[in-house]
């Protein structure tokens, strides 16, 4: 805690582990997601302490949650907020040690292991199958069930590979992951994503958003080609 001050009846803002004091008092995440149940506080703390990464860490989960809610609203879908919160903040847990299993898709492994985090946190475990279904379906290549939370989380996660945020995420992986082992590989991944990912979207709202995000990526890639001797000097 860096400092705290009380002036009259007003608290001054301070920073506590990356959160402002006003957020701590309001019990919300950095992006304003309410932590209105104790199990949510526990799950969020787990993600903050264990799932840090430039491309699929805590902030990515916050974006997925917020965007999934917007997609549900846009398509008029009723979603279970508990299921969405749990799935959004745990969907990539098996991309991290010690939860990863070599040779297994992190979506399936994460779905299998999510209960071990949720049950001691006090999550309503009758909803676990829906959380697991959403986690299994979150990747762009996954088959998506008819459950609304699975659909909007899948689309939110896919949209997060497109647009300016998609470019930022993939470039951040350069030299660290196979899909971006160097800059030319990162650019090839971005080109493939801009062409192929929109077709995997389910909701009408996501499909509409994808149009703008693909245009953003194509503009970036065109400028990059122009500034790198048609990509030969990356």
Model feature map: region roles:
Residues 1-12:
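Bacterial N-terminal signal peptides that target proteins for export
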Residues 10-22:
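Bacterial N-terminal signal peptides
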Residues 33-34, 50-62, 66-78, 90, ...:
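Divalent metal-dependent phosphate-bond-processing catalytic cores, especially two-metal-ion Mg2+/Mn2+ enzymes
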Residues 64, 106-119:
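An active-site-proximal "capping" alpha-helix that borders the catalytic cofactor pocket
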Residues 81-100, 106, 110, 130-139:
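His-Asp-centered metal-binding catalytic motifs of divalent-metal-dependent phosphohydrolases/nucleases
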């Amino acid at each position: 805690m860096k400092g705290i001050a009380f002036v009259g009846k007003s608290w001054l803002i301070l920073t506590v582990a990356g959160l402002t004091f006003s957020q701590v008092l309001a019990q919300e995440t950095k992006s304003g997601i309410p932590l209105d149940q104790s199990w949510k506080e526990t799950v969020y703390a787990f993600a903050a302490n264990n799932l840090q990464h430039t491309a699929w860490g805590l902030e990515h989960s916050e974006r997925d949650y917020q965007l999934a809610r917007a997609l549900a609203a846009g398509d008029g879908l009723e979603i279970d907020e508990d299921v969405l919160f749990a799935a959004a903040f745990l969907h990539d847990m098996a991309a991290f040690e010690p939860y990863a299993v070599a040779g297994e898709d992190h979506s399936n492994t994460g779905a299998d292991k999510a209960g071990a985090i949720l049950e001691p946190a006090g999550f309503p475990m009758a909803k676990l199958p829906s959380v697991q279904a959403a986690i299994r379906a979150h990747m762009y290549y996954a088959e998506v069930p008819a459950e609304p939370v699975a659909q909007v989380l899948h689309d939110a996660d896919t949209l997060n590979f497109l647009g300016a945020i998609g470019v930022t995420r993939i470039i951040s992986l350069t030299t660290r992951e196979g899909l971006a082992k160097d800059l030319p590989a990162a650019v090839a991944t971005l080109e493939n994503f801009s062409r192929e990912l929109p077709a995997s979207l389910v909701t009408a709202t996501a499909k509409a958003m994808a149009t703008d995000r693909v245009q953003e990526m194509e503009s970036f890639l065109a400028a990059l080609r122009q500034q790198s001797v048609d990509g030969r000097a990356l």
